[in-house]
Amino acid sequence: MEQCACVERELDKVLHKFLTYGQHCEQSLEELLHSVGQLRAELASAALQGTPLSATLSLVMSQCCRKIRDTVQKLASDHKDIHSSVSRVGKAIDRNFDSEICGVVSDAVWDSREKQQQILQMAIVEHLYQQGMLSVAEELCQESTLNVDLDFKQPFLELNRILEALHEQDLGPALEWAVSHRQRLLELNSSLEFKLHRLHFIRLLAGGPEKQLEALSYARHFQPFARLHQREIQVMMGSLVYLRLGLEKSPYCHLLDNSHWAEICETFTRDACSLLGLSVESPLSVSFASGCVALPVLMNIKAVIEQRQCTGVWSHKDELPIEIELGMKCWYHSVFACPILRQQTSDSNPPIKLICGHVISRDALNKLINGGKLKCPYCPMEQNPADGKRIIF
């Protein structure tokens, strides 16, 4: 963090100089334009009158030319000073950060350089599609000769089409999508469809008393959601009482908050990605964020290993010598290790919950069976092995 702070201080200085230079440059040029404009008007007036150029006007022209030359030289000098400040940022980065990080990961991690390049290009393309930068993704595919199937693109195209409509406060495409995927959204316990109907109802409320009948008619869409969202529906129906007086000055003014649009975009993105089998954040974003957390630790480990000359500790290409805590945000799958066999469970050897509540792996359960009965290794309870239930975390 200290290294980042040092670089940030240099960046702040550069940004301040950019701002100051821009303001000074704009002011100086405006003054020059004003002076030249006045001089031009005087010259035009003298030409119309047919009078020769006076000594005073000649002096003014000389002073104006000198002022232009001095201003240009001053701006050029200030511009050079900015270049030196930018160079200091680069030096601060070199001084505070280790530029050589290739040694942290062995080349043996990748099957080949071509495979490495292909995986990276695919990760970048997927990130661009997910961010809605479709034209950039297509351009990268053409330049890298990367073949991307239409089936891969289609979910991203649909997702971004609906998100663009939501950013323009158009609920139509999102509502159509939610209705067509209603059953699968219910299986996810999603409230997306209700939130979309609620937002449409709020838009009608914002239309004032003229939209009251239309809002009452639209409220019939809430009927399927009455059991799960009764309180929220009551609040919205109660707001109709204040419609003629104006919701802005009523206890229901929070309904008009623009944050509802940001919330609906987040909800749609999360639920749609879950439904389409996509992650909310692209693999590139997750890898980059994880790398920012893990890289300093890996650099320290590498330095210690080299200092103590114990390179054999880090010999596996798919395993680190120590566990690195990346934070809850990077936890995607719960992991259970069997306390009996001290092995991580898997699809072929899943965790099994016994009647007594203790959990062991299936392999451990099979090894503990004696005479058709199973005695829990942690308590005196004896039970039928068939009574064990598989657990899915």
Swiss-Prot record:
CTLH domain ranges (all copies): 155-212
Zinc finger (RING-Gid-type): 338-379
Catalytic activity: S-ubiquitinyl-[E2 ubiquitin-conjugating enzyme]-L-cysteine + [acceptor protein]-L-lysine = [E2 ubiquitin-conjugating enzyme]-L-cysteine + N(6)-ubiquitinyl-[acceptor protein]-L-lysine
Example of a GO biological process term: proteasome-mediated ubiquitin-dependent protein catabolic process
GO molecular function annotation: ubiquitin protein ligase activity; zinc ion binding
GO cellular component: cytosol
Pfam families: CTLH (PF10607), zf-RING_UBOX (PF13445)
PROSITE patterns reported for this sequence: CTLH (PS50897), LISH (PS50896), ZF_RING_GID (PS51867)
Subcellular location: Cytoplasm, Cytosol
Species annotation: Mus musculus (Mouse)
N-acetylmethionine: residues bearing it: M1
Primary role: Core component of the CTLH E3 ubiquitin-protein ligase complex that selectively accepts ubiquitin from UBE2H and mediates ubiquitination and subsequent proteasomal degradation of the transcription factor HBP1. MAEA and RMND5A are both required for catalytic activity of the CTLH E3 ubiquitin-protein ligase complex. Catalytic activity of the complex is required for normal cell proliferation. The CTLH E3 ubiquitin-protein ligase complex is not required for the degradation of enzymes involved in gluconeogenesis, such as FBP1.
Protein's name according to its UniProt entry: E3 ubiquitin-protein transferase RMND5B
Chief location category: cytoplasm
Record domain LisH: where: 116-148
Subunit description: Identified in the CTLH complex that contains GID4, RANBP9 and/or RANBP10, MKLN1, MAEA, RMND5A (or alternatively its paralog RMND5B), GID8, ARMC8, WDR26 and YPEL5. Within this complex, MAEA, RMND5A (or alternatively its paralog RMND5B), GID8, WDR26, and RANBP9 and/or RANBP10 form the catalytic core, while GID4, MKLN1, ARMC8 and YPEL5 have ancillary roles.
